[in-house]
Amino acid sequence: MLVMLTSTLILVLMVLLAVAFLTMVERKTLGYMQLRKGPNVVGFMGLLQPIADGVKLFLKEPVWPTAASPALFIAAPIMALTLALSLWMFIPMPQSISTINLTLLVILAISSLSVYASLGSGWASNSKYALIGALRAVAQTISYEVSLGLILLCLIILTGGFSLQAFIYTQEHTWFLLSSWPLAAMWFVSTLAETNRTPFDLTEGESELVSGFNVEYAGGPFALFFLAEYSNILFMNTLTAIMFLGPLGPNNLNILPIINVMMKATPLIILFLWIRASYPRFRYDQLMHLMWKNFLPLNLALFTLQLSLAVSLGGAGVPQM
């Protein structure tokens, strides 16, 4: 019990530290892509800027609108960060803190619960801009989770199991990125939409909604939403690295698995930042059109194809119930 608590605490601290420096990397990347410096004053080359930002936000007085619902207004960001951090318990590095066989289903279920934090914050703010942003976030998240779920089903047929360890063992000789690149492309775009990142950041369209569902937040509660968002970005890219870029070769679980995953997740995270600097925001109807009229039929077709291939080849790879 004590070992599990210690492992959980270390994991949470490492994730929060990684999130802090991801914000600095993002600001520096955007700065250089826009021909400017970015943060470069606090510490050596601005390395301490995220620490200064965090201290500043948490020292500010938490304020909320007079008409807001205080309990839910404070509970929503806490719930968002708790759900975002709890997802990391299932990442094998090389062993996950929580060892269950239905890892992917639990990850999908916990990520689905994040819509309650968004909706609760928008409703509790008692602001029409926050509520519209929250409703957009809920519709977008639920829509693209359909795509994520179907892609996971296709990959589960190939691995024969619901755990991330099964993905690692299956990719000993070749990556799923090479054999299932259409699924990988749709998965990556869906993770952009799932984490509300550019070009799918309709929930915080500045010209329409000021800042989306967290428009009324300031200080510590706003920082919690910020940490939850970037923790989800790190988690989704780490999950992508494990699912599509699994370690190659025998005995792969013993060869510095954390370094292996980090080396593969880092380019994906940089790609997230590159996309933010390069692409404009979609219209809301284009966002939904992409999911329901493009991704969904293609996912269903690929799922049917892979299921029929697995059955026709003697049931190889089909999960045993």
Swiss-Prot record:
GO cellular-component term (any): mitochondrial inner membrane
Transmembrane segments: 2-22, 71-91, 104-124, 148-168, 173-193, 224-244, 255-275, 295-315
Membrane association type: Multi-pass membrane protein
Database matches in InterPro entries: NADH_UbQ_OxRdtase_su1/FPO, NADH_UbQ_OxRdtase_su1_CS
Superkingdom, taxonomy of origin: Eukaryota
UniProt-recorded Gene Ontology molecular function terms: NADH dehydrogenase (ubiquinone) activity
EC number from the UniProt entry: 7.1.1.2
Keywords tagged on the record: Electron transport, Membrane, Mitochondrion, Mitochondrion inner membrane, NAD, Respiratory chain, Translocase, Transmembrane, Transmembrane helix, Transport, Ubiquinone
Catalytic activity: a ubiquinone + NADH + 5 H(+)(in) = a ubiquinol + NAD(+) + 4 H(+)(out)
UniProt subcellular location: Mitochondrion inner membrane
GO biological-process terms attached to the record: aerobic respiration
Family: Belongs to the complex I subunit 1 family.
Function: Core subunit of the mitochondrial membrane respiratory chain NADH dehydrogenase (Complex I) that is believed to belong to the minimal assembly required for catalysis. Complex I functions in the transfer of electrons from NADH to the respiratory chain. The immediate electron acceptor for the enzyme is believed to be ubiquinone.
Protein name: NADH-ubiquinone oxidoreductase chain 1
